[in-house]
Amino acid sequence: MQIADKPPPLKVDKLSVNRSGQLVLDDISLTINRGEFVGLVGPNGGGKTTFLLTILGLLKSKSGTIELYGHKKVPNSILGKIGWVSQHASNIPKNIKITVKELVQLGTLNSSNMFWRFSAEQNQQVSKAIELAGLQSVENKNISNLSGGQRQRAVIARALASNAEFILLDEPLVGIDRDSRNSLLKFLDKLCHEAQKTILMVSHDIAAIQQSSHRMIFLEERIRYDGAADCFPSLADLANLRGIKPVHDGIDSPDELYQLESMGDKE
């Protein structure tokens, strides 16, 4: 529930976006309130990443408005509340020697400590972020020696160290095993419930979104579904949505990973 008199982290009204002369997002309207864990799903080319990049101001809209914490023209003080973790953020080359703690410290870097001189407050932010991510036991390990799930938590902790309140995640579940996936999802749920963070996560993994997020949005140029994650239509019903078919590998089970495929262009 939205706290009275405080604007929501995100409010989008009648947003449309073109890319390469093609309409990718059409008439998108939604509000995401504080403390929500929202899963954004849809086919390749459906506009998910385009939506995130437009929120961040990296792409221009054709029409419509985006408000972050009540601001259409977002000041730096509000930008500091936004944490962005791209799909490839955890793909750190093995020849780069950096520990978990050093990676998380990057989240606090600014003009006052660009030479890695951290105040007591900044060190406290780093310690808190590492604790929230459950990485205390590996904070001095090289990031390349961690599991895929631990690396994802580390890059999210970097965003937390900057005091981000609204975290945007692009495909954080790609390339990690089931146990790491479940651990990461529990961590994200904890951030919402205990730390009152707001999360918007893009994923192709519908089963994971249904199990973990509070709300699911199905985006394919337009919003096709916006509601409780556990009330989302069954995978068999996805064939009724234009250009979509459910695809799975392996044996049928409740925990099976599903992806959405489309013949459309990549987003």
Tell where the protein language model's regions lie, with residue ranges:
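ABC ATPase nucleotide-binding domains
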Residues: 230-267
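Conserved ABC ATPase "signature" region
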Residues: 105, 120-138
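Conserved ABC transporter NBD signature motif
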Residues: 64-78
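H-loop (His-switch) and adjacent beta-strand-loop-beta switch element
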Residues: 216-228
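Catalytic Walker B motif of ABC-type/P-loop ATPase nucleotide-binding domains
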Residues: 167-171
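H-loop/switch region of ABC-family ATPase nucleotide-binding domains
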Residues: 203-204
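Helix-to-loop junction immediately C-terminal to a conserved catalytic motif
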Residues: 56
